[in-house]
C-alpha cells in the first residue's frame, strides 16, 4: 500500500477549499483518507495554509510521498529540509 500526502477538494463551485490529507494512493481524490493533516484556502489573499508539522513529519518518516503541490507547501514550511536532515542523521547513526 503506497501512501500519499495530497489535496482533498472541498468547498463549492468556484470557491475551492482543500484539506491536506494522508490517503492510500489507490483511493479517489475526494474519497476515503487516513488522516487530515492541514488545509489550504486559495481564496484568501494571501492564500492560507495550515500544516500540522508533527503529524506530517511522522508520515514522511514512515514513507508517505507528498504530491508536487503539497511538496511545495512543505518546502516553504521547512519540513522537507527537516526530513532530509533527519534521514541523514539516521543514516550516520546506522553506520556507527
UniProtKB/Swiss-Prot annotation:
Coiled coil: none annotated. It comes from the Bacteria. The keyword Membrane does not apply. The keyword Glycoprotein does not apply. GO terms for molecular function: structural constituent of ribosome. Keywords: Ribonucleoprotein, Ribosomal protein. One of its GO terms (cellular component) is cytoplasm. GO terms for biological process: translation. Signal peptide: none annotated. Pfam families: Ribosomal_S16. PANTHER family: 30S RIBOSOMAL PROTEIN S16, SMALL RIBOSOMAL SUBUNIT PROTEIN BS16M. NCBIfam families: S16. Belongs to the bacterial ribosomal protein bS16 family. This is Small ribosomal subunit protein bS16. It comes from Oenococcus oeni (strain ATCC BAA-331 / PSU-1).
